Swiss-Prot record:
Pfam family membership, one: RNase_PH
Protein name: Polyribonucleotide nucleotidyltransferase
UniProt GO cellular component terms: cytosol
Entries under SUPFAM superfamilies matching the protein: Eukaryotic type KH-domain (KH-domain type I), Nucleic acid-binding proteins, Polynucleotide phosphorylase/guanosine pentaphosphate synthase (PNPase/GPSI), domain 3, Ribonuclease PH domain 2-like, Ribosomal protein S5 domain 2-like
Organism listed in the record: Baumannia cicadellinicola subsp. Homalodisca coagulata
Biological process, per Gene Ontology: mRNA catabolic process; RNA processing
GO MF annotations in UniProt: 3'-5'-RNA exonuclease activity; magnesium ion binding; polyribonucleotide nucleotidyltransferase activity; RNA binding
Length: 697
C-alpha cells in the first residue's frame, strides 16, 4: 500500500511540495518536487560496496526533460526523446557541481542521480526545482552526504533583487544568477549579467544564500521524518610508512621542479621524479602497487605546491599572486573568414573566428518552455593536441558545451540587437593550446574577433579565472590561474566583463569556510586583472571596424506592404525562387513586410531590391508605363508593364484608326507605351495606347 510523505513550504512567491514514498520506491531514495506545476522526479541510487580497484568517486548526474511534461510530442522520425540536448547537459553539470564537495573525502561508492521533468509550467524553470529535489533525495537516502544544500535563482529588476523570477520577469532582468549553498557557505554560482558592478553581484550572491536557508531548513525537517540511517563506510587507509618514504625521496626534488616556469619542461621533470620514486620503492618491495605510490605522489605534489603559495613564495611559473601571464593578441589572421583573432595568455591560446549569416542561419531551439530562435552561436572546441595528448575527435563533450556556454554568457550583454545588426553571428573558439583558463581566453578572443568582423558590440569584454589556496585562516587569492593551480586550489572563480561591469560569473568552491569577505576580495582582484587585459586589448583593436568583410553577405532591408508578400513569393514560391537564382542573393520576408536581401555582391543585391520594388509597385490609374507585348489575341494584346503585372490593350485602344488585325500593329516582345485606364476589384488592368500613339510611332 502506498504511504506518501508530503511536506510543503512557501519559497518566495511559490509553494514547494516535496513528496516521497509513492513513486520509484526501489531506488535508494526518490523525491517528487512540485513548484507551481513544474514537477521534477529525482531518484538516487547508491551502491554500498566499492568496486575493487576503484580510485575515484563515480558520481553520475543526469537531468532529462520529457516532452509529455508540456503536453507535446517529441520531434524527429521516431517521435521519441534521444540524446540529451545542450540545455539538459548544462543543467546536469549545474546540479553536479555543488554535489561533489558534499560527499566525504575518500568515498568511492557508485552513486547515480537522475532528475526527470514530468510536468512543466512555462513560467517556472525546472533547474531550481531539480536542484532542490536532488538535495532532498540525497539527504534522506542514507548515502554518506555531509548536509543538504539549497538553490535559488536571483534576478535584478528595477534595482531590486527578485527571488526565483519567472521566465517573463527574466526578460526585464539585468541579472540571471543561480546560487547553491549550504547553511554556512556558498558552493556554486552561475550567472549572466548586463554589466553589473562587483558590489551588485556580491549582494545578489548573499541575497540568494540567505533566501535558500528556508529550503535547507525544510529538507532537514524532512530528514527527521523519513531520513534513512547513514551507511557505515570506511575510507581507504593510507600507508603512513609508504607516505614517509615517498616524501623523503621526492620532496626536495619537487620543490626544485616547481621553480621551472615552462609547463612542458616542468611536467617532464616531475614525471622523471615520479618514475625514480616508483623504481626505488618497487625495488625494495615488489608487492607495492604502482597506483598506490602514484596517488601518494600526487597528494605530495599538491601539498608542496599549496604550501609554497601559502608561504609567500612565487607561483609555479614564477609570478606573484596578482600577476597576469604575458599577453599576445592579433586580429585578421585568417583572410577568408569574416572575422578572426588569436588570443594568447601564457601557455593558453584561443583561435577565434566569426561567421556572419542571415536570419535563416539562426538556430531554432525547441525547449519544454517553448520554441525560440538564437541569432548568436558560440562553439568551443578543446582538441586533445592543445594539451599535448592523443584522444578521440568527434562531437562536443559535456565540458566543451559548458565552457562554450560560459563564454557566450560573457559576451551576450554587449551584443547588438537584431535592429542594430541584422545578422546571425556564429563564433567558434578553437583552443589550440591550454594551460588553464581556456574559457576566459575564449571570451577575450571572441571580443577581439567580433570587433574585427565589424560587429558593433557595445563594449570590449575580457575574462579571467581566479583561484584560492586556503588553510584555516590563511589564504591567498590567485589571478589568472594555471591548470595545476586549478587542480590544487580550493576555488575556481571565473569572471568576465567590460570596463562598465560584470557580464558573467561562475564560481565553484571545493572547501568549507569561504566567507563573503573572501568572495569580495576575489571580485576586486578579478576586476584589476580584467582592466589590465582590456587595456592590452585596446592597443590591438579599440572599436569595431566600420565595415564588414568583403566575403561576408551584405544585408539590405526594405519594407513592402504585407498584402504584396504573395506577389514577391509567387505561386508555390516561383517568383522568389527565380529572383534568388537570377541575382545570386538570399531573400527573406517577414510577416510584417520586412524584406532582407543578402549578397556578397552589392550590385546583385541592388538588382534584387529593384526587382522587388518593381513587383510591389502600385499601378496608378492615368500613369504611362513602358510595356512589353507578351500575347496577341483577336480582341487585343496583353502588355507586361512590370515583372508581374500584365494588362490588356483592347483592339479598340490600340490606335484611333479602325484596326482589323492586331498583328498588323503589334508583335511579340515589342516595347510600347501604355496608359492605365482602370484597375478593377480583381486587380485586372485595362490599358490604352491611344494617348501615347505619337510616342509609339
Amino acid at each position: 500500500m502506498l504511504n506518501p510523505i508530503v511536506h510543503r513550504f512557501q519559497y518566495g512567491k511559490h509553494i514547494v511540495i516535496l513528496e516521497t514514498g509513492i513513486v520509484a520506491r526501489q531506488a535508494t531514495a526518490a523525491v517528487m518536487v512540485n513548484m507551481a506545476d513544474t514537477i521534477v522526479l529525482v531518484t538516487v541510487v547508491g551502491v554500498k560496496q566499492v568496486k575493487p580497484g576503484q580510485k575515484f568517486f563515480p558520481l553520475m548526474v543526469n537531468y532529462q526533460e520529457r516532452t509529455y511534461a508540456a503536453g507535446r510530442f517529441p520531434g524527429g522520425f521516431f517521435r521519441r526523446e534521444g540524446r540529451p540536448s545542450e540545455g539538459e547537459i548544462l543543467i546536469s553539470r549545474m546540479i553536479d557541481r555543488p554535489l561533489r564537495p558534499l560527499f566525504p573525502d575518500g568515498f568511492l561508492n557508485e552513486v547515480q542521480v537522475i532528475a526527470t521533468v514530468v510536468s512543466i509550467n512555462p513560467q517556472v524553470s525546472p533547474d531550481i526545482v531539480a536542484m532542490i529535489g536532488v538535495s532532498a533525495a540525497l539527504s534522506i537516502s542514507g548515502i554518506p552526504f555531509n548536509c543538504p544544500f539549497g538553490a535559488a535563482r536571483v534576478g535584478y529588476i528595477n534595482n531590486q533583487y527578485v527571488l526565483n523570477p519567472t521566465i517573463a520577469e527574466l526578460v526585464d532582468s539585468s541579472l540571471d544568477l543561480v546560487v547553491a549553498s549550504t547553511a554556512n557557505a556558498v558552493l556554486m554560482v552561475e550567472s549572466e549579467a548586463k554589466q553589473l558592478s562587483e558590489e551588485q553581484m556580491l549582494s545578489a550572491i548573499i541575497f540568494g544564500h540567505e533566501q535558500q536557508q528556508l529550503v535547507i531548513q525544510n529538507i532537514n525537517h524532512m530528514v527527521t521524518i523519513v531520513g534513512k540511517p547513514k551507511w557505515s563506510w570506511q575510507a581507504q587507509v593510507i600507508d603512513t610508512n609508504l607516505q614517509l618514504c615517498v616524501t623523503e625521496l621526492a620532496e626536495s626534488r619537487l620543490n626544485e621542479a616547481f621553480c621551472i616556469s615552462d609547463k612542458q619542461e616542468r611536467d617532464v621533470c616531475i614525471e622523471t621524479i615520479k618514475s625514480d620514486v616508483l623504481s626505488a620503492l618497487q625495488q625494495k618491495n615488489e608487492t607495492i602497487e604502482e597506483e598506490t605510490i602514484s596517488n601518494i605522489f600526487a597528494n605530495l605534489e599538491k601539498q608542496i605546491a599549496r604550501n609554497r603559495i601559502l608561504g609567500g613564495k612565487l607561483r609555479i611559473d614564477g609570478r606573484n599572486h596578482k600577476m597576469i601571464r604575458s599577453l599576445d593578441m592579433r586580429t585578421s589572421i585568417l583572410p577568408r573568414t569574416h572575422g578572426s583573432a588569436l588570443f594568447v595568455r601564457g601557455e593558453t591560446q584561443a583561435l577565434v573566428t566569426v561567421t556572419l549569416g542571415t536570419e535563416r542561419n539562426a538556430q531554432n531551439i525547441d525547449e519544454l518552455i517553448g520554441e525560440r530562435t538564437d541569432r548568436f552561436l558560440l562553439h568551443y572546441n578543446f582538441p586533445p593536441y592543445c594539451v599535448g595528448e592523443i584522444g578521440l575527435v568527434g562531437s562536443p563533450k559535456r565540458r566543451e558545451i559548458g565552457h562554450g556556454r560560459l563564454a557566450k554568457r560573457g559576451i551576450l550583454a554587449v551584443m547588438p540587437t537584431a535592429n542594430e545588426f541584422p545578422y546571425t553571428v556564429r563564433v567558434v573558439s578553437e583552443i589550440t593550446e591550454s594551460n588553464g583558463s581556456s574559457s576566459m581566453a575564449s571570451v577575450c578572443g571572441t571580443s577581439l574577433a567580433l570587433m574585427d568582423a565589424g560587429v558593433p558590440i557595445k563594449a570590449a569584454v575580457a575574462g579571467v579565472a581566479m583561484g584560492l589556496i586556503k588553510e584555516d585562516n590563511n589564504f591567498v587569492i590567485l589571478s589568472d590561474i594555471l591548470s595545476n593551480e586549478d587542480y590544487i586550489g580550493d576555488m575556481d572563480f571565473k569572471v568576465a566583463g567590460s570596463k562598465n561591469g560584470i557580464t558573467a560569473l561562475q564560481m565553484d568552491i571545493k572547501t568549507k569556510g569561504i566567507t563573503n569577505n573572501i568572495i569580495q576580495l576575489a571580485l576586486n582582484q578579478a576586476k584589476d586583472a580584467r582592466m589590465h587585459i582590456l587595456n592590452m586589448m585596446e592597443q590591438v583593436i579599440s572599436m569595431s571596424r566600420t565595415d564588414i568583410s568583403p566575403f561576408a553577405p551584405r544585408i539590405h532591408t526594405i519594407k513592402i506592404h504585407p498584402d504584396k508578400i504573395k506577389d514577391v513569393i509567387g505561386k508555390c514560391g516561383s517568383v522568389i525562387r527565380a529572383l534568388t537564382e537570377e541575382t545570386k542573393t538570399i531573400i527573406d520576408i517577414e510577416d510584417d513586410g520586412t524584406v532582407t536581401v543578402a549578397a556578397t555582391d552589392s550590385i546583385k543585391a541592388q538588382q534584387a531590391i529593384c526587382r522587388i520594388k518593381d513587383i510591389t509597385a502600385e499601378i496608378e490609374v492615368g500613369s504611362i508605363y513602358h510595356g512589353k507585348v507578351t500575347r496577341i489575341v483577336d480582341f487585343g494584346a496583353f502588355i507586361a508593364i512590370s515583372s508581374n503585372k500584365e494588362g490588356l490593350v483592347h483592339i479598340s485602344q490600340i490606335t484611333n484608326k479602325r484596326v482589323e488585325k492586331v498583328a498588323d500593329y503589334l508583335s511579340i516582345d515589342q516595347i510600347v507605351l501604355v496608359k492605365v485606364l482602370e484597375v478593377d476589384r480583381q486587380g485586372r488592368i485595362r490599358l490604352s495606347m491611344k494617348d501615347t500613339n505619337l510616342t509609339n510611332k
